[in-house]
Every structure is written in structure tokens, then in C-alpha cells.
Amino acid sequence: MEASSRVTVQVLLLALVVQVTLSQHWSYGWLPGGKRSVGELEATIRMMGTGGVVSLPEEASAQTQERLRPYNVIKDDSSPFDRKKRFPNK
């Protein structure tokens, strides 16, 4: 009985491997073989045809500089491994 169940499991595993290797994955906009249709590619390029330049509002630069300031400025004389500050009970 052990041999027949082992053969059954092997046949099922082989069938699963064959099914997975022979199946075709179809994505939206892709043709078999991983090739994209030229019409869709052309439409995508037209949508992205902004000249590669993204304009930012002038007010955003002041807000960005405020956001990029560090919250905590570390003093040069303090050590990050100062045990007395980190572990006051020891």
C-alpha cells in the first residue's frame, strides 16, 4: 500500500509540474510570448510626452525646505554611546 500511495503522489506531482510549465500567463496589454502590442506602446508614449520636464510650484520650495530641516541636531561633544544618559540605573 505504501508503494501505491507513493506512486500516486509522484503522478500527481508530475501532473502539477506539467500543468504549471505548460500554462500561459496573460497580463493585460501583453501578447503571448511577453510581447506588447505596438498600438498600446505608442499610446503610452504619447501620454508621457510631456518633454520630460515636471514643473513645480514656486511655493513648494519653501515648504520643502521647512520639511527637510532636522528635528534634532546632535551636538558634536555628545557621544551616542554615553551609558550614563542611556542607562541611568547602571
Curated annotation (Swiss-Prot):
Localization of this protein: Secreted
Entry keyword set: Amidation, Cleavage on pair of basic residues, Hormone, Pyrrolidone carboxylic acid, Secreted, Signal
Disulfide bonds: none
Gene Ontology terms: cellular component: extracellular space
Sites bearing Pyrrolidone carboxylic acid, chain numbering: Q24
A Pfam family assignment: GnRH
Transmembrane segments: none
Signal sequence, renumbered to the chain: 1-23
Modified residues (Glycine amide): G33
PROSITE patterns recorded: GNRH
InterPro entries for the chain: GnRH (IPR002012), Gonadoliberin (IPR019792)
Entry's family note: Belongs to the GnRH family.
This protein's name: Progonadoliberin-3
Recorded name of the encoding gene: gnrh3
